[in-house]
A protein has these predicted regions:
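Conserved ATP-binding/catalytic motifs of P-loop helicase motor domains
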Residues: 1-171
Length: 171
């Protein structure tokens, strides 16, 4: 991974040592959190991760909790990003009152890795459904700023994950 980052193949992106560490950990670990404030290079890290997975012929899915965040990450990476709801193929249940997701443990997402941007805005219900839709072995890379807006729904997932000290977090 480091050799790719430092190769002539990709000299369009200059990463700091901490950004390189975030990229390497994301490629190697099953679950990774990347957190930092505005302007710390989170989007640059995301683009580097995508390029490495693409060089390995691995499919990566990009998503975010809101349409605005998905559009922003699409524009900055040049890769399609969807809202988490759209990625999970949401639909309304029988009586139009409950939301169901067609991507779940019975019909998981087909990818090697999934990158969730603006993770601070993801609530516990959406996170639960996203996790259900991941196949065993799918890498989960969560990116966000813990000091940004928390989710409207229940749960402060990103903050709780970081505080737990159980998942590799790069700041």
């Amino acid at each position: 991974v480091l050799m790719y980052l430092e190769s002539e193949e990709d000299n369009s992106i200059n990463l700091t040592e901490m950004q390189k560490e975030a990229v390497v950990q994301s490629i190697l670990n099953g679950v990774t959190v990347i957190t930092g404030g505005p302007g710390t290079g989170k989007t640059t890290i995301i683009l580097s991760i995508i390029k490495i997975f693409e060089a390995m012929n691995k499919k990566v899915l990009l998503c975010a909790p809101t349409g605005r965040a998905a559009k922003r990450i699409t524009e900055s990476t040049g890769r399609e990003a969807k809202t988490i709801h759209r990625l999970l193929e949401y639909a309304y249940g029988e009586n139009d009152s409950n939301l169901v997701f067609n991507r779940n443990e019975n019909s998981p997402l087909d990818c090697h890795a999934i990158i969730v941007d603006e993770m601070s805005m993801v609530d516990i219900l959406l996170m639960n459904n996203l996790l259900k839709a991941l196949k065993r072995g799918t890498k989960l890379i969560m990116v966000g700023d813990v000091d940004q807006l928390p989710s409207v729904g229940a749960g402060n997932i990103l903050s709780d994950i970081i505080k737990s000290n159980t998942i590799r977090t790069i700041r």
